Amino acid sequence: MTTTTRVRPLRSDVREQIVTAAGAEFAERGYAGTSVAQVAARAGFTKGAVYSNFEGKPELFAAAMQAYFAGAVVGAFADALGAAASPSDQPTAQAMAHALAENVLLGERWPTLLGEFRAVVAQEPALRDLYAELRLTQRTQLVDALRRAGEQVPLRVGLDLEVAATLLHTCVHGLSVERSAAPEAMPTALVEGLFTQVLEGILA
């Protein structure tokens, strides 16, 4: 008789599956409409498995938000950098602005979800450290992306990378929220123009 050995999934794999499921639930239901039980069911684990990896729903949201940001925003910046480094008739800032607009402003709900979570944080001071850590991590990722960008395209002499990353971060978030709420008031050409102005202040 053959005995089948059940392989226990790695903790990192379980965590990744939970974060992916959480991202899908939050995107569909919003922050208030999502529960830990729903995330667990979607991931195919028990609630206990979720709580062994995360303290609760706020921490789940922060992890899912960070996964979105790393993929969509930092990834979009990498794509934009690639576009700028490729042969083109467009000036570098315009090429990057076009790529950023295409990748970032796709109607994703996450910037709006972050606003929903921020409203919860305003009412629950205990969550402020979690929110601050999330935003600081995002800024650090953009600083690192800008530092890598400087190896491929020239940056303005004396540029403060943290200030530039914060400006870019604020621009991406604000434009995404406005575009999501009223696309007709924030047309693509205007978005590209705004990104171009910001990037011209960053690039040499």
What feature does the model see in each segment?
Residues 1-29, 33-45, 58-62:
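Basic, helix-initiating cap at the start of DNA-binding domains
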Residues 17, 21-29, 75, 79, ...:
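Solvent-exposed, amphipathic alpha-helical segments
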Residues 48:
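Key DNA-contact positions within bacterial/archaeal DNA-binding proteins
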Residues 54, 62-68:
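Alpha-helical DNA-contacting segments of helix-turn-helix folds
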Residues 63, 76-111, 161-168, 192:
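Hydrophobic alpha-helical connector segments
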Residues 92, 105-129, 177:
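Amphipathic alpha-helical segments used for helix-helix packing
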Residues 128-132, 136, 150-202:
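Hydrophobic/aromatic-rich alpha-helical bundle segments in the mid-to-C-terminal region
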